């Protein structure tokens, strides 16, 4: 799907179910719920197989279990190929999730270590050609 705005922030409360290996968005006062904050920006969007698709850049403020998958599904824009959080989604499509960048401070030198790549996987083929 495509978000309603070109960029935004989702703030939800997530609760993990370890037995089912799933998390869900719940009301703030739910016991065991943890705050989850996700920023997004639409990099590209197009029609594919009769459906609107968007390529998003995500920045997490928090690192919750399946956070991106849960928050996007809860917002009505589940990831392409995510059968766990969008059971009615397309079958046979790879999960449209790729960590394209990682940065952290080296524990000994203090130097910022930064790693980047293009999105990988068949879910990104139509988008990567344009990047």
What does each of the following model-derived ranges do?
Residues 1-131:
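RNA pseudouridine synthases
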